[in-house]
Amino acid sequence: MKTWRENMKKILTLLLITFLLNSAFAVIIKAPAVSLTDRGYVGVPINIQINVTKGDGHVFMDTMPLTELDMQGSARIAAKVAGEVTGKDMSKYNVYITVRSDVPVVGGPSAGGTMTIGIICELMNWSLNKHVMMTGTINPDGSIGPVGGILEKIEAAKKANCTIMLIPKGQRYVEVEGNKVDAVEFGKKLGIKVIEVGSIYEAIPYFTNKKIIMKEYPENPLIEEKYKDIMKELSENVLKTANEKYENLSKELSNSYVGYEYQKALLNELTTSKSLLEKANDEYLKNKYYSATCSAFNALIKLETIEHTLKYLTGEEDVKTFLTEVQNKISHDKEIVYSKNVTTNNFEEILAGRIRIAEAEKLLDNAWKSYYLGNYDEAIKYGSFAKLRGDSAIWWVSLKENDNNGKIINEAKLKSLAQQYLDNAETILTYVETLFPNLPTDDLENDLESAKEAYKDGDYLLTIAESIDTCVKAEIPLVIFGDIEYSKKYARNKINLAENLGITPISALGYYEYANSLNDTISKIMYYKYSSYYAQMDIDVIKELNKSISENISSEINIVTNENVNIEETTTKENNVGIMISAIIGGLIGFAGGYLARRVSA
């Protein structure tokens, strides 16, 4: 009995020492929050303690009082971003986050940026400036997202004896009871300097007097040229097909009459397709080959729809026969796509083909639904798009058909990576759903379900692609009012890193080029997101197959310290992010998920 007691004492002593050591070396950081009282909403500071130990990639959270799920989602994303910023492989660490507040607080995602700073400081063993506080959500690309309660949180900073308050870029001006309040001036009256930051990189120097510079990689001119050669050939083929179809349909439509309303509608669509073709031809002449392909592809969708609408109206073809033919064609296209060997040189093209086949099948499902509801016009539109989406799958898997230098990949080796992408998609979607509970996310849930089904079927490339789709669409509300130049630079740098590893990131380069050609903000951000995700996917696949590359990438960060730190303060034009979000947020996911109302990539 005595021996047992002595052993227990030793174990308890070791546990106590471990706890004390962890507490001694923990990072403790304050964050502002909002609490609901009898007098309304008030700002309160909360304490966040962060410990990082060797582990296996878990994030643990202990909160008192209990917080909402959005804070837990923030914590996982914060750990992921901290790993990328510091060059640490977070699958080798566990993160423990303890949150304490004297009063119940409303929500929790606004501490995402703060938690990221805390985890970075723990990983790097850096001390914190206790007089700095920050509010802002953390986005997967490291940008800081908008929050509510800015003025109350500035008051919380005052209560915590802070002198600097960092807020998300674009939130300087806050509307209170119909009046605009300048948060910077509001802070001055409390003795607090309020500064806007757009990314975690901008926030780090204020807390640490150190600056982590995102390592910038140069473009690889040989790979850029290779990409252009591949895309030039594809754009020529698609342009030729689209131009010929336009000429044929122009003659056919001029010789047909299908009633005033239909004739007018079809002529309008023909005019739009002509504009798209002119844009495509212009982009081709400017060496923007992927953009030219996309513009021509969008023209083809309209022309295909005109062709089969005309056949239906003239009695040459019934809708059911058309959809059955499309269904058979997609089945044949799928056989071709899945018959290709996946190699280290073509895995991206095969992935692109598989996701396009999956999209073609979804479009065809919509076509059949429209048909059985008696909406034949919509059925023809979806059917035409489905047919062409199947065509584009074949285009992609044929891009490197003559490149036999790559090693065949055993797709089972990508199972772990596919699980990571699936987990990440689920985390981001849950995060967005808790941040924006009124946001319609049925399309995103369907994308996530498709990713899970692909994983169950052992189709790990498709799992990754469907997961990326979910992530990109889900992130739009998080970054829509962020710095678009940051998204652009982030994507370009990911592409350059892939190129420096000898990868030809065709999808990433294509999406980047396409984003540059677009005018509306939502589309640009969406395709920059696709670009950065696909470049990262290329890097991740190569790392998964060659672990030595992973070690080289992880160690590459640039740190500037002390007197060398030069903090540039920026401010934004007057706007009201909160009002703008509530005005358009409901339409964002519908835009991202909708097939017929947006321009699409080839």
UniProtKB/Swiss-Prot annotation:
Belongs to the peptidase S16 family. SUPFAM superfamilies: Ribosomal protein S5 domain 2-like (SSF54211). It holds the Pfam family Lon_C. The keyword GTP-binding does not apply. Keywords: Cell membrane, Membrane, Transmembrane, Transmembrane helix. Signal peptide: none annotated. GO terms for molecular function: ATP binding; ATP-dependent peptidase activity; serine-type endopeptidase activity. GO terms for cellular component: plasma membrane. Its main location: membrane. The active site is at 110, 153. InterPro entries: Lon_proteolytic, Lon_Prtase, Ribosomal_Su5_D2-typ_SF, Ribsml_uS5_D2-typ_fold_subgr. GO terms for biological process: protein catabolic process; proteolysis. PANTHER family: ATP DEPENDENT LON PROTEASE FAMILY MEMBER. It is a multi-pass membrane protein. Residues 25-210 form the Lon proteolytic domain. This is Uncharacterized protein MJ1318. The chain crosses the membrane at residues 11-31, 103-123, 577-597. It comes from Methanocaldococcus jannaschii (strain ATCC 43067 / DSM 2661 / JAL-1 / JCM 10045 / NBRC 100440) (Methanococcus jannaschii). It is found in: Cell membrane.
